[in-house]
C-alpha cells in the first residue's frame, strides 16, 4: 500500500486534507513555500501531520540556491553550482564544503521532524534553464565527486539521498513543469555522460531514492523516463542494480501529460516501475486517484519508508552544534563570494 505522495494547500491541515492523509494509499507528503511562514509554524504543522499519520514520509524540495522552500529561520544554502567556483577550482576544498552543506541542509530539516529533501540534483549543467546552477557542474566527474560528498554530509545528519532527474535533464531547453522536453541526442551520449553520476553513486550505495525526468529520449525509448519500463526496470533496476525507492516526478507537470489523465498517468508510472507517485498542486486530481484508481494489491517492493531518517545518527548530529554553526558560516561565505562576482 501507500503509493501516493500529496501536498497541502496552506499553513495547516484542513479536515478534507486530514481525511486524505488517513487514506491507506497515502504514504508521503511534500511541503512547499506556501506551507511555511516561520520555523515555529513549520514545527507546529509537522506535529499536526504526525498526529494524523505518525509514520508518513514528510519531504520537501530543499536543494539550495533558488530551490529552497523554507528561508526565514533557515540558513540559505548556496546553489550547488556555486561550490566549486567559490573554492576557485580546488576540488579537495569544494568536496569538504559540499559535505558540510549536505550536513547543514539535512540537519536543519531533521530538527523540524522533516524526513527528506529531494536532493541532490545529479543532472549535468547543459542548456536547461530549469536546471542551471542546481547542478554541481557540467562535468560528470565533478558532479560525482561533489554529489558524493554532499550525500555523505546528509548521511552524517541521518538523512537519505534522492538523486534526480534520471537519466539526465540538463540537455533539454524545455521546462517539464510547463512543456514536454525531448532530448534528441543519441543514446550513446546519454550513457557515456549524463547517466554516469547515477551509475557511480548507485554502485557505491549512496542513493536511497531516485526521481526520473519527465523527458523523452526518442533515440532510446519513446516514453518519458518516468513512464518508461525500459529506463526504470531495464536500465535503472537491472543494469545499474538500483534497489532503492523510485519516486515519480509530479504527475501534475506538463511533462506528465504524455500519459493522459491522472488515472492514466498513475497507471503508467506504476507500471513502468515507480514505487511512489507524486501529485502536487491539484487536490481534485488527488481525489480522482484516491476514489477512482485501481491501486496495486501488493505493497510497493521498495516502500518509501526506506527513506525514513536514521534517528540515532540524527540525535548525534543534533548534539554537534559547533559543526552546525560552522556550516552556517560556510554557507554565508560561499554566498558572499558569489555575490562579489556579480
From Swiss-Prot:
Pathway: Cell wall biogenesis; peptidoglycan recycling. The active site is at 177 (proton donor/acceptor), 249 (nucleophile). InterPro entries: Beta_hexosaminidase_bac, Glyco_hydro_3_AS, Glyco_hydro_3_N, Glyco_hydro_3_N_sf, Glycoside_hydrolase_SF, NagZ_Beta-hexosaminidase. Its main location: cytoplasm. Its EC number is 3.2.1.52. It is found in: Cytoplasm. One of its GO terms (cellular component) is cytosol. One of its GO terms (molecular function) is beta-N-acetylglucosaminidase activity. The record marks 175 as: Important for catalytic activity. Keywords: Cell cycle, Cell division, Cell shape, Cell wall biogenesis/degradation, Cytoplasm, Glycosidase, Hydrolase, Peptidoglycan synthesis. GO terms for biological process: carbohydrate metabolic process; cell division; cell wall organization; peptidoglycan biosynthetic process; peptidoglycan turnover; regulation of cell shape. Substrate binds at residues 61, 69, 134, 164-165. It catalyses: Hydrolysis of terminal non-reducing N-acetyl-D-hexosamine residues in N-acetyl-beta-D-hexosaminides. Disulfide bonds: none annotated. PANTHER family: BETA-HEXOSAMINIDASE, BETA-HEXOSAMINIDASE-RELATED. NCBIfam families: PRK05337.1. Plays a role in peptidoglycan recycling by cleaving the terminal beta-1,4-linked N-acetylglucosamine (GlcNAc) from peptide-linked peptidoglycan fragments, giving rise to free GlcNAc, anhydro-N-acetylmuramic acid and anhydro-N-acetylmuramic acid-linked peptides. Belongs to the glycosyl hydrolase 3 family. NagZ subfamily. This is Beta-hexosaminidase.
Amino acid at each position: 500500500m501507500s503509493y501516493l505522495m500529496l501536498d497541502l494547500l496552506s499553513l495547516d491541515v484542513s479536515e478534507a486534507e486530514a481525511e486524505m492523509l488517513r487514506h491507506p494509499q497515502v504514504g508521503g507528503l511534500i511541503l512547499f513555500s506556501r506551507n511555511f511562514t516561520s520555523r515555529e509554524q513549520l514545527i507546529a504543522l509537522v506535529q499536526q501531520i504526525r498526529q494524523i499519520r505518525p509514520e508518513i514520509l514528510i519531504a520537501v524540495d530543499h536543494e539550495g540556491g533558488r530551490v529552497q522552500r523554507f528561508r526565514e529561520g533557515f540558513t540559505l544554502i548556496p546553489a550547488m553550482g556555486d561550490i566549486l567556483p567559490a573554492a576557485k577550482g580546488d576540488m579537495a576544498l569544494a568536496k569538504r564544503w559540499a559535505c558540510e552543506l549536505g550536513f547543514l541542509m539535512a540537519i536543519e530539516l531533521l530538527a523540524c521532524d522533516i524526513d527528506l529533501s529531494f536532493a541532490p540534483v545529479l543532472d549535468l549543467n547543459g542548456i536547461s534553464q530549469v536546471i542551471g546552477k542546481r547542478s554541481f557542474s557540467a562535468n560528470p566527474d565533478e558532479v560525482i565527486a561533489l554529489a558524493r560528498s554532499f550525500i555523505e554530509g546528509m548521511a552524517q545528519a541521518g538523512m537519505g539521498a534522492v538523486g534526480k532527474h534520471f537519466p539526465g535533464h540538463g540537455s533539454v531547453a524545455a521546462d517539464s513543469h510547463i512543456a514536454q522536453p525531448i532530448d534528441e541526442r543519441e543514446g550513446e551520449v546519454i550513457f557515456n555522460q549524463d547517466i554516469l553520476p547515477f551509475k557511480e553513486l548507485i554502485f557505491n550505495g549512496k542513493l536511497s531514492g531516485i526521481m526520473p525526468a519527465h523527458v523523452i529520449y526518442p533515440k532510446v525509448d519513446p516514453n518519458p523516463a518516468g513512464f518508461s519500463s525500459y529506463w526504470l526496470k531495464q536500465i535503472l533496476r537491472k543494469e545499474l542494480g538500483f534497489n532503492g525507492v523510485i519516486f515519480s516526478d509530479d504527475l501534475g507537470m506538463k511533462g506528465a501529460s504524455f500519459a493522459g489523465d491522472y488515472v492514466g498517468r498513475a497507471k503508467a508510472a506504476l507500471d513502468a516501475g515507480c514505487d511512489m507517485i507524486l501529485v502536487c498542486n491539484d487536490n481534485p486530481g488527488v481525489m480522482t486517484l484516491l476514489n477512482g484508481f485501481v491501486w496495486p494489491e501488493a505493497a510497493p517492493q521498495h516502500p518509501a519508508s526506506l527513506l525514513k531518517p536514521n534517528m540515532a545518527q540524527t540525535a548525534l548530529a543534533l548534539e554537534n552544534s559547533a559543526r552546525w554553526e560552522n556550516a552556517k558560516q560556510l554557507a554565508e561565505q560561499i554566498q558572499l563570494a558569489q555575490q562579489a562576482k556579480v
